[in-house]
Amino acid sequence: MAMSLKAEKRPDLRGSVTRKIRKQGYVPAVVYGNKTKSQPISVEAVDFLKTVREVGRNGLISLEVEKGTKHQVMVHDLQMDPLKGDYLHIDFFEVDMSSEIEANVPVRLTGEARGVSEGGVLSQLMYEITVRSLPADIPEEITLDVSSLAIGDSIQIRDVRGNVPVQVVNEDEETVVTVQPPATEKEEETEAAVTDSEPEVINEKEEPAEEAKEE
């Protein structure tokens, strides 16, 4: 079920206006969709934070604009201040509940990989997986247990696909997480590979010195 969030119309969202809005505790935003004309709005930062914590990053939100029409939306894009962590701007996308959409779902790793205790390094290559489904069926996150991964092991999309209840868009060969060998081991392997690839040097026969001319 979608959680309700109130919004205010903001016909003017120029730079000076957006700064003023943020100081008042609001976040500049826009709501749009395939059948919805883009409309600038603002929402209270505190209310938005509570809503996202409740429904998740890909959750459905019932956006009420000044006691008018309610829009069933999802957060399509969220801009944040990298230093302060404040919300700068939000894009709300109005969804058709009967049509499938694509969404990026966060990946959460659980457990401690066996290879890490053996000296390996856990490397997460993908932090989001793209899925396609009805808006109401999009998972909040995809959880992967890495406990059984030894050094050299990895989890690819093909390993994830069967455990996700919706369609995964990514290619099977894409690697989500892997356990790499220790740095020293990797360096030795690299040096060995370089040595093997070096061409063999064939010693050339020295040319006999020219005989000195007889005086």
From Swiss-Prot:
Keywords: Ribonucleoprotein, Ribosomal protein, RNA-binding, rRNA-binding. GO terms for biological process: translation. Residues 174-215 are annotated as: Disordered. The keyword Nucleotidyltransferase does not apply. InterPro entries: Rbsml_bL25/Gln-tRNA_synth_N, Ribosomal_bL25/Gln-tRNA_synth, Ribosomal_bL25_b-dom, Ribosomal_bL25_C, Ribosomal_bL25_long, Ribosomal_L25_dom, Ribosomal_uL5_bac-type. Residues 186-215 have a biased composition (Acidic residues). SUPFAM superfamilies: Ribosomal protein L25-like. GO terms for cellular component: cytosolic large ribosomal subunit. One of its GO terms (molecular function) is 5S rRNA binding. This is one of the proteins that binds to the 5S RNA in the ribosome where it forms part of the central protuberance. Belongs to the bacterial ribosomal protein bL25 family. CTC subfamily. Part of the 50S ribosomal subunit; part of the 5S rRNA/L5/L18/L25 subcomplex. Contacts the 5S rRNA. Binds to the 5S rRNA independently of L5 and L18. This is Large ribosomal subunit protein bL25.
